[in-house]
Amino acid sequence: MNKHTTVLSGLTSHLSRSEFEKAVKDHQGDKGVRTLTTYDFFKMMEYGQLSGCFSVREIENSMKANSTKLYHAGLPQLKRSTFCDAMEKRDSHIFEDVFHAVVSKAQRIAGKAIKQFKNPLRIIDASIISLCLSKFDWAAYRKAKGAVKLHLNLDGDNLIPYDAYLSCGKVHDVHGMAELCREPGVIYVLDRGYVDYKSLYDIELRGSFFVTRMKSNGKYKRVKNNPHAKDGPIVSDVVIQMTGNNTRKQYPKELRKVRYYDKEFHHTYEFITNNFTLTAQEIADIYKARWQVELFFKWIKQNLKIKSFWGTSENAVFTQIWVALILSVLLWICRTLDGISASAHQILQMIKTTLLSKNSVFGLCTNTAPPPEIYSSQLLFEELL
């Protein structure tokens, strides 16, 4: 069977099968499995995500309606009970590992792409995904509400996930920050909710930079003024030392505080950073880039299935979110390698009803005809190479 004959299999081909099987082996995903392998389960999850199915029954019915095309996509028939069992029992850490493998490939492809700044830009934020507490009783968030939280480290240069961490909704953002801000030599952009001076100092000690907004109750003393244009948006640029009883101990070094006036929104912002070499305008521009992570959260919630779930256990919910994140990176890889100018949203709209068609994502986006059929006898040479 030609693994590149359908849109779905072509997209999946950007995922290393050997790295996938390594993740399965590491977590014993196929131990005792008789019918549905973890890889086939993953492809069914892909199908459900990309076709916009709200339930397992809908996935099953959709695949039945396309049963004659399943072979070319390398998909077996879906049995609802087997699929639901896999949702509950296949360790979600398998798909977390696969996500990291796909991210590594994306970073290799990005290579030495032009960066906005000298250091790589990483945007940190978290988004709440609401759940019905009566169905997801393990996900208690507030009195009558359940939720999980997606903590994300977004590659600010390529606008794709770089790292992620999933937790129950109660987990504070700062804990996610500790999980995601471990890389040296980068610039982390953080919302004001992440201002924990001990955690910020950990970033400093790792040899990285941060840009965030200062809390209104922060106590400090001015050490010196940095020169800046009086007629521009920079109101002030000063070096400060924290003076609070706890904050002075938690962050003993000096910080830089930039006050910036946004003419468009008629609002003044105060940023703090441990970077003393970038211009004040660059500091403001870096923080403005934080909006990209909000756009990503909006995109993934609107285009992939991470608000309605096909299982009720923590493992099932986390598995579904990891698969959505994997697909977001695979779409970026596909767009980049094939030079597709269409947005990820436009691509998803085109492939939603053509997943099992004999075509490629590139063919869909450029209106080119699919490649000619390759018969099994010709595939012998592919196996021998």
Could you say what each language-model-derived stretch is?
Residues 1-62, 90, 94-101, 115-137, ...:
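Single, function-defining residue in the core of a domain
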Residues 64-73:
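Extended, structured, electrostatic nucleic-acid-contact surfaces
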